[in-house]
Amino acid sequence: MRAAVVGVTGYSGTELFRILSNHPEIEEINLYAREKEGISKRFLNKEVSAFRNIKNELLPYDAKEIMERNDVVFFAVPAGVTSKLAAPFIQNDFPVIDLSGDFRLKDPKEYEKWYKKPAAPKEELEASCYGLADFYKPDTSYIANPGCYATATILGIAPLLLKHLIKLDSLIVDAKSGVSGSGKKLTENSHYPVINENALLYKINSHQHVPEILQQLKKFDSEIEALQFSTTLIPVTRGIMATIYAKPKDADGFSLETLKKAYAEVYHGKKCVRVLEEGFPQIKDVQYSNYCDIGVAYDELSKTISVVSVIDNLVKGAAGQAVQNMNDYFGLDELCGLPKVPAWP
């Protein structure tokens, strides 16, 4: 197979290149800049110092050439880009895995409200599918890869809704992300003197992944209307920890065993989700892997459920899940080419 990557020089793009380079079914990777014309020759080893031995040229963007030369294309670009570029791929039913947020929300008004950018045409949004790989196989050729916070949060909450265990108005999510989740571009919050030995709460109840999370949770339980969602930047390079709190629907008949059974049943056979029998996961447990690790607890005194969900934001939260979606689309084993052992320590 031949794969194209548009936007390889960002953090998600470089992670994607790393994974695809070790994929046994990928024989050729072609790299494209976002610009169509007027760019001087650019080479990956000059753009990303870690890839100094990689001589691939970044080619000017050309949708026709991408489709003629490749079997699949990955877009690892910021929001607001693929909404303008998707049309020829959708018209030709060409496989796309889009790591941006442009096709995750099905309501154009919701996208424009949360992303502050023009939305893709509604007919194009309807031609795409949401690639939550541990629950769905792609049913269209245009796959919207889930966001990092959304992935950790949805996987952490799913059994609570699918098993109808909680009071829907009690859901609280406290999510924390490493600095790579903010992207490659330097901001004041990601500046070393600011984030080092610090924790920064940002976008409380206004993060663009909130409507994405709710859109998916409604598929698990259509009666859910809202959740309390906060995001904190922490001084680690990669990783997300989502701590989820909720109240059981029937506290009198609820127990920790009820909770454990629900998670074991929902995630039975799902290769990329690991439910701990005891204790809680830590970010280090999943770094450089495509796993989501989950631990649960129940406090009988306060009648409160606690769930901890951790992922690597650049792998399971971006490039790894994108490759998992590609594997599913082409009928490969979903773990094909994905790192099966996390890095430790």
Where are the predicted features?
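N-terminal Rossmann-like NAD(P) cofactor-binding subdomain of oxidoreductases
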Residues: M1-E197, Y202, A297-E300, W344-P345
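Conserved active-site and cofactor/substrate-binding residues in soluble primary-metabolism enzymes
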Residues: Y11, G80, A127, C148-L155, ...
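Predominant activation on well-ordered alpha-helical scaffold segments within soluble catalytic domains
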Residues: F17, I154-A158, V210-L214, A264, ...
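Generic secondary-structure signature for well-ordered alpha-helical cores
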Residues: S21-E25, L162-I166, H207, Q215-S222, ...
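Short, solvent-exposed beta-strand edge segments and adjacent coil->beta transition regions
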Residues: D139-T140, E197-A199, G239-T243, S306
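Short Gly/Pro-enriched turn/cap motifs at secondary-structure boundaries
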Residues: L201-N205, L233-P235, Q282-V286
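Oxyanion-binding "anion nests"
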Residues: S206-F229, L233-T237, M241-T243
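C-terminal active-site/capping subdomain that shapes the small-molecule cofactor and substrate pocket
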Residues: A242-P345
